[in-house]
């Protein structure tokens, strides 16, 4: 996985981030430009579908030394705050985005994340619906507990958690309870 991340925070919020979705979008586009530069240099290759994955795996099975092979990646967005509108999700899909984690830390434009609570707002539900239509996977990693359960009931596409620990081992709302892990499995 390769990540784009640029969070929006309302003015006056102490969390780090951009004060407009447009600024956050621009930051993700700069990150995308870096990934494209790495592709142009032959260092990386974006995997957008099963055909691309199969081709990449076959390339890694040949006898060329590993240091001469590009690293394959699936593009993910951590925190959807940079998506100015659902049209921007469509644009991102066209350039290769295949997974979205709608939340990050605190309150978000679509859903609340770590150290926050509350269900998804109407924009968050519309985001999930559009992700389903585009076959974009849902990364449930930073969803607050309320939003996690709501998303699991609402979203019918592929779901995963990219980077979590067990709440039984690390007692913090950022981590997944046993019930949340069971729901994913």
Q: How would you name each of these model-derived features?
A:
Residues 1-117, 122, 171-185:
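N-terminal hydrophobic targeting/anchoring segments and the immediately downstream early-domain regions
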Residues 102-183:
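Active-site core of metal-dependent hydrolases
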